[in-house]
């Protein structure tokens, strides 16, 4: 029993909770530094050649579960331990403190007043019921009163005692919600061409609604570098009588019916090329060997003596570069320009079709996260509210009225209020 009590004392201590929070913060940073959820062989290949800090190789990364930090056993255990620490702190300190604050403290002897933070006394007339008048004055100013024949107790701001408990509840919900989200959230990266649609399916394999890319714009800096990507998405469903247009751009996701859609990337997915009076829609692929934002494909051109040419493009406006892979000669085809002849074939570029790169995320823990942060903010605000207490005692023998006050925070502000109330009670 003694061991259990000592364990609870240690777990509920502020030092233990802060240590856990620092540990969780550091390991969360590790989770952002090391890519998460990839194939185990990728970690082995990469970190065996370049170990972390020269010590941790690929096999150790997997053994320590650093390839999935947020769902690892030790990370979840630390979250559970922090929840227990916060709950133990609430039951051991905050709730008893609230219960104590709810009980009225009755000061029957003027000697107790001299031990308070603020105290004053003055001679009064016996003909006036000063306790009754003080009671009326304080009630008008929003104080709660417990009154006796020759004394009263008053308090205000008791909600401040609830603040730490609400913050702890919010933190516990946040930790539970985060852990739940790590296991239940789903994320998918999808590239949509202009006019292309995507059906979103729920767990029962029934179509919830469809999204369609109506328009996609790229804003560029004066030097041509991409500044912003903007997608105009149509959400529609005949069954649900749904038809809405929403816009997403980088750092401004769409939140719709439990889904969050982020603007993540873009690409040139297709081109429409006219070759010898025949239209072809050609699908392009990224070519990272040439550059970061370059797409292209290999094509044969020529009516009799066919040759291989590499078609590449690096933006949504063109031009299309045509490279002979043997002699490295280059030609450029501009959008809607006159046809050019390459190896007896006539080519013209009719259309460039960009794609919007979207990340579609379903995270059922989002309501828990919002609730948690709401509680944390409210609890923090409540915690800033001072709990003030005033006691008034009338001594019939000395004809003196004793007034004393106590505050758990902002003593300077309470001192001004106390002096003002004392003067009003004296002159009332």
Swiss-Prot record:
Its main location: membrane. It is a multi-pass membrane protein. One of its GO terms (biological process) is cytochrome complex assembly. It is found in: Cellular thylakoid membrane. The chain crosses the membrane at residues 14-34, 72-92, 162-182. Keywords: Cytochrome c-type biogenesis, Membrane, Thylakoid, Transmembrane, Transmembrane helix. It comes from the Bacteria. One of its GO terms (cellular component) is plasma membrane-derived thylakoid membrane. May interact with CcsA. PANTHER family: CYTOCHROME C BIOGENESIS PROTEIN CCS1, CHLOROPLASTIC. Belongs to the Ccs1/CcsB family. Required during biogenesis of c-type cytochromes (cytochrome c6 and cytochrome f) at the step of heme attachment. HAMAP family: CytC_Ccs1. This is Cytochrome c biogenesis protein CcsB.
């Amino acid at each position: 029993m003694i061991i259990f009590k000592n364990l609870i004392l240690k777990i509920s201590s502020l030092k233990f909770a802060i240590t856990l929070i620092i540990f969780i913060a550091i390991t969360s940073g590790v989770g952002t530094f090391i890519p998460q959820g990839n194939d185990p062989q990728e970690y082995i290949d990469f970190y065996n050649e370049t170990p972390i800090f020269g010590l941790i190789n690929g096999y150790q990364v997997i053994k320590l579960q650093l390839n999935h930090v947020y769902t690892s056993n030790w990370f979840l255990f630390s979250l559970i331990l922090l929840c227990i620490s916060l709950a133990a702190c609430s039951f051991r300190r905050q709730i008893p403190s609230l219960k104590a604050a709810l009980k009225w403290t009755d000061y029957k002897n003027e000697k107790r007043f001299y031990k308070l933070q603020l105290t004053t006394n003055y001679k009064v007339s016996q003909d006036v019921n000063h306790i009754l008048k003080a009671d009326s004055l304080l009630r008008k100013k929003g104080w709660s009163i417990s009154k006796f024949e020759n004394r009263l107790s008053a308090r205000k701001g008791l909600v401040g005692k609830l603040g730490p408990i609400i913050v702890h509840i919010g933190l516990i919900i946040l930790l539970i919600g985060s852990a739940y989200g790590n296991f239940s959230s789903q994320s998918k990266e999808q590239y949509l061409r202009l006019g292309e649609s995507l059906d979103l399916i729920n767990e029962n394999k029934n179509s919830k609604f469809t999204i369609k890319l109506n328009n996609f714009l790229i804003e560029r800096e004066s030097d041509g570098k991409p500044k912003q990507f903007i997608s105009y998405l149509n959400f529609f469903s005949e069954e649900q009588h749904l038809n809405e247009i929403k816009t997403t751009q980088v750092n401004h996701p769409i939140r719709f019916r439990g889904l969050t859609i982020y603007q993540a990337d873009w690409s040139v997915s297709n081109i429409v090329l006219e070759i010898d009076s025949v239209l072809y829609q050609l699908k392009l692929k990224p070519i990272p060997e040439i550059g970061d934002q370059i797409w292209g494909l290999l094509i044969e051109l020529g009516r009799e003596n066919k040759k291989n040419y590499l078609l590449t493009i690096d933006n949504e406006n063109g031009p299309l570069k045509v490279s002979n892979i043997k002699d490295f000669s280059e030609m450029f085809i501009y959008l809607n320009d006159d046809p050019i002849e390459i190896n007896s074939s006539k080519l013209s570029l009719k259309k460039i079709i960009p794609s919007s790169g979207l990340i579609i995320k379903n995270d059922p823990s989002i309501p828990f996260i919002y609730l948690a942060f709401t509680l944390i903010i409210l609890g923090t605000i409540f915690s800033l509210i001072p709990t003030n207490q005033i006691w008034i005692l009338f001594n019939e023998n000395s004809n003196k009225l004793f007034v004393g006050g106590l505050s758990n925070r902002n003593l300077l502000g309470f001192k001004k209020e106390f002096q003002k109330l004392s003067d009003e009670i004296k002159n009332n």
